[in-house]
UniProtKB/Swiss-Prot annotation:
It comes from Danio rerio (Zebrafish). The lineage of its organism: Eukaryota, Metazoa, Chordata, Craniata, Vertebrata. GO terms for molecular function: calcium ion binding. It comes from the Eukaryota. Interacts with ggcx. The gene is calub. It is found in: Endoplasmic reticulum membrane; Golgi apparatus; Secreted; Melanosome. Involved in regulation of vitamin K-dependent carboxylation of multiple N-terminal glutamate residues. Seems to inhibit gamma-carboxylase ggcx. Binds 7 calcium ions with a low affinity. Residues 68-103, 104-139, 151-186, 188-223, 229-264, 265-300 form the EF-hand domain. Residues 1-19 form the signal peptide. One of its GO terms (cellular component) is Golgi apparatus. This is Calumenin-B.
Length: 315
């Protein structure tokens, strides 16, 4: 039975304890690129195809005729148009692109879902998750490596309640996804920051000082000489992380560190697709406008809708 995030936490700590002291831990969350292709529309639309469909779904472009491609693109457009008003806005396009890029996450959640929806009611309640993850462990003594399973359960419960937007103590598929992958959801960012601070803050003052910051990344293990990157991180803390120069990082400073305001690739791509396809320049797209530019969205030779559309229910 899969157990997340407990097994992940255990594995992470094992890796942490066995890591070489020269290795650096990175807690910063960056958005993955929409595509590894160059974004050069004068050359081809490969980047746009991968951004719109997801990289796995855009690998092959020789399976469908243009007519089939247009028909299936039309089905996707109906899903992008969330309010069913007949138009696709830039925000709807942005959300679709983010959804397509999260495909691997949703597949992971599907696997977890099978292990935790014990009564098959299409929800995972906190009790179901707790029983499946901690049921047999709580009766055992905590291991010598410092794990406290009751504390971990309390922390998971707090995260579960944060993900549970309607407060009914049971998660639908989207809420369960937010619980398992909080860094992917804006409304879960506070819990990501809080959990990070709790991990690093060893003296319990609710802040991260320089020693705690460095200690989380680097363990000296008797070696008197520090690698150069440790010196650089000390300078980063003093000059950039600690913005108010009080020698410690608070919640806002920690957020700026681990959740930097990266360039929003999905938003930029959504605006690009809208600009290129909006024939009447009204700031929104009709299904016909998108289908007319199907070569931009999915390719002129038929695309890997084999996956993206045959499996359209996942979207």
């Amino acid at each position: 039975m899969e157990q997340w995030p407990l097994l992940f936490v255990v594995a992470l700590c094992i890796l942490q304890s066995s890591s070489k002291p020269m290795e650096k831990k990175d807690r910063v969350h960056h958005d993955a690129p929409l595509s590894n292709k160059d974004h050069d529309d004068e050359e081809n639309f490969d980047y746009d195809h991968e951004a719109f469909l997801g990289q796995e779904e855009a690998k092959t472009f020789d399976q469908l005729t243009p007519e089939e491609s247009k028909e299936r693109l039309g089905k996707i457009v109906e899903k992008i148009d969330e309010d069913h008003d007949g138009f696709v806005t830039a925000d709807e396009m942005k959300r679709w692109i983010k959804h397509a890029q999260r495909r691997w996450i949703y597949e992971d959640v599907d696997r977890q879902w099978q292990a935790h929806d014990l009564n098959s009611d299409s929800f995972v309640s906190w009790e179901e998750y707790k029983d499946a993850t901690y049921g047999y462990i709580l009766d055992e003594a905590d291991p010598e490596d410092g794990f406290n399973y009751r504390q971990m359960m309390t922390r998971d419960e707090r995260r579960f309640k944060m993900a549970d937007q309607d407060g009914d103590l049971r998660a639908n598929k989207e809420e369960f996804t937010a619980f398992l992958h909080p860094e992917e959801f804006d409304y879960m960012k506070d819990i990501v920051v809080l959990e990070t601070m709790e991990d690093i803050d060893k003296n319990g003052d609710g802040l991260i000082d320089l020693n705690e910051y460095i200690g989380d990344m680097y363990s000296q293990n008797g070696d008197s000489s520090e690698p150069e990157w440790v010196k650089t991180e000390r300078e980063q803390f003093t000059e950039f992380r600690d913005k108010n120069k009080d020698g410690r990082m608070d919640k806002d400073e920690t957020r700026d560190w681990i959740l930097p305001a990266d360039y929003d690739h999905a938003e930029a791509e959504a605006k690009h697709l809208l600009y290129e396809s909006d024939a009447d320049k009204d700031g929104r797209l009709t299904k016909q406008e998108i289908v007319d530019k199907y070569d931009l969205f999915v390719g002129s030779q038929a695309t890997d809708f084999g996956d993206a559309l045959v499996r359209h229910d996942e979207f």
